[in-house]
Each structure stands twice: as C-alpha cells, then as structure tokens.
C-alpha cells in the first residue's frame, strides 16, 4: 500500500447496546494521536469530524434497544462511507459495532458502482450474525453481519443493493457465539475462525487464505476491528470482554499482513469505551494497530509506558 489519503470519520454510535460510553470513542482516538501516527507513515490525513444520525423518531420498540436511532445512524454512515471511499481510505472511529450496519452498506454501494466485489474481514470475539428477530438482548450491535448478508427481519433499515455473498466474509477471533447464531452460521459459506483454530494452527494461515480469495477476485476489502478481538488483558476498554482473545502480537501480525496485501479499502475501529479504559491504554493499542495496517513495522512501533 503506497502513500494513502486517509479519511478519518468519527462515528459516535452508542445506540447498539445498553451500556453507555462508546460515543466518546472518536475523541479518544484523536487524543491518542491517530492523525499523527498515520501522518508519520507518509499518508495524508483528512479528519471530517463526527457524523450525526439522520433525523429519526424516538419511538420505543418493545424488544429492540434504540431501533430508530440505529436506523438513523445506518443511513448517515452509509453515505459517509460512500463519500469517504470516493476520496481515499475511510477509517471509522467508533462507536459501537452497530456503526458497521452503515459502513458496510456504504462500502457495498460503492463497490457495486465500481463493478467490484466487496469482501469483509470481521475481527471479533462475536459473530454479530443476529437479526432483530433472533436477538435475545435487543442490542443491535450484534446484527451487522446478519443485515449485510441479507438475513430477514431488518424492517425499516435501508434496502441493500444486494446481499453480500457469504463466501466473501471471514470472521476471525470467535470465542463467544450463542446457540441461535451458531445454528444460523452452521450451514453458511462464511469463513469462521475461532480461537481454538488460531491456537492450533496460528492466525496467519486462515487470514492468508482469505486474502488470496480477495486478491483473486480483484475485490475491495472492508475490515472491521472490534476491541474485543483482543484479549481484555491488553485491551480492557470494551463492554463485551471475553477472556482468551488475540494477543498484541497476533493483532499486529493481522494488520501487517493486511498492509502487505495492499487490499484494505476501508476500516472500522469499534467498541472502544473510554469510560472503561485505563489511562487511555486501549485507545493507544487500537491506534497502534491502525498504524500497522497502514504500514508501520515492528521496529517503528514505539514502546508504550502504561
């Protein structure tokens, strides 16, 4: 990946779950100097500020948390993603994972207009494959992959230009999948890599296989990095902590491989809750990972004093 025009877009989405705090995420990334970290790599940086949801009703839903607001965010972020992709490589600073309902939709629209297939790499402890009908929690941050792959039940959400092909999706880092999602995923073509597979064979092999498919298809690649992909021992600032996650080194390897491939066209940084952080530790880790995805090497990465 040569020098890139990075478009920073704040997505202070806090409607996808009931535990508050992710709305502070964009400012935490800015405070952790994400702009300087990427500029130091030779990239040009444009910070477009924070997106706001399109106007929406505040009508309560008997089962789903903040449905109308989340639909408003989806519409707004889809437009921001399309515009960002027109101008460079958009980096969405979240914000909970419901933001990806919009960012992936926007990437799908842009890919369709460019006559290229879109692929999605989901780095997450969870599969986020629920629908509004199957979620027990009512939290819509657990539904983005269900939405973009065309599962039913997303009444009121923007219409998809097409259903993202299952074989174009890889989820890496799985270690918390509930029974309904497991059953729904079982017969899909989605590539699913859980932590046991990573323990047994390493993280490079399945990622390399997926990237080979993206390259062979001439595809665009949207990467969605959830804080809980990482072990909470190194990234505690997330409301959905699940022990046994990826190590710092595994995280950087993934990002370095993405940079080496030259395939990544957009990036989500999601679920950072600064209210739960330790002196900005997790925000800094996520900034370092973003820098690795944009070309920082091991010997360039500064040692952090936490």
Q: Where are the predicted features?
A:
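Short active-site oxyanion
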Residues: 88-90, 166-170
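Solvent-exposed alpha-helices and their adjacent loops that cap or buttress functional pockets
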Residues: 1-2, 111-115, 137-138, 160-164, ...
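Short, structured patches in soluble enzyme cores that scaffold and shape functional sites
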Residues: 122-125, 149, 173-176, 194-196, ...
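A general structural motif
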Residues: 170-178, 247-249
């Amino acid at each position: 990946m040569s020098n890139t025009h990075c478009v920073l877009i704040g997505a202070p989405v806090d409607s996808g779950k009931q535990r508050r705090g992710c709305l502070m995420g964009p400012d935490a990334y800015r405070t952790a100097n994400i702009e300087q970290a990427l500029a130091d790599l030779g990239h040009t940086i444009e910070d477009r500020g924070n997106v706001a949801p399109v106007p929406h009703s505040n009508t309560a839903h008997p089962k789903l948390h903040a449905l109308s607001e989340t639909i408003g965010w989806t519409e707004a972020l889809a437009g921001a993603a399309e515009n960002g992709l027109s101008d460079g490589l958009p980096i969405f600073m979240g914000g909970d994972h419901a933001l990806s309902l919009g960012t992936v939709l926007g990437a799908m629209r842009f890919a369709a207009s460019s006559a290229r297939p879109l692929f999605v790499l989901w780095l997450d402890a969870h599969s986020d494959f629920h629908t509004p009908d199957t979620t027990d929690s009512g939290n819509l941050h657990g539904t983005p992959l269900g939405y973009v792959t065309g599962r039913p039940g997303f009444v009121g959400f923007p219409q998809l230009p097409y259903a993202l092909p299952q074989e174009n999706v890889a989820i890496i880092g799985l270690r918390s999948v509930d029974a309904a999602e497991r059953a729904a995923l079982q017969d899909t073509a989605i590539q699913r890599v859980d932590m046991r597979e990573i323990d047994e064979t390493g993280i490079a092999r399945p990622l390399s296989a997926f990237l080979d498919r993206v390259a062979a298809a001439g595809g665009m690649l949207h990467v969605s990095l959830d804080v809980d992909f990482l072990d909470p021992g190194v990234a505690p600032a997330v409301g959905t902590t699940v022990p046994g996650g990826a190590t710092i080194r595994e995280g950087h390897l993934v990002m370095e491989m993405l940079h080496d491939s030259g395939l990544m066209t957009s990036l989500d940084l999601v679920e950072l809750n600064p209210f739960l952080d330790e002196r900005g530790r997790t925000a800094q880790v996520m900034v370092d990972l973003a820098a690795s995805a944009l070309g920082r090497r091991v010997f360039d990465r500064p040692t952090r004093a936490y």
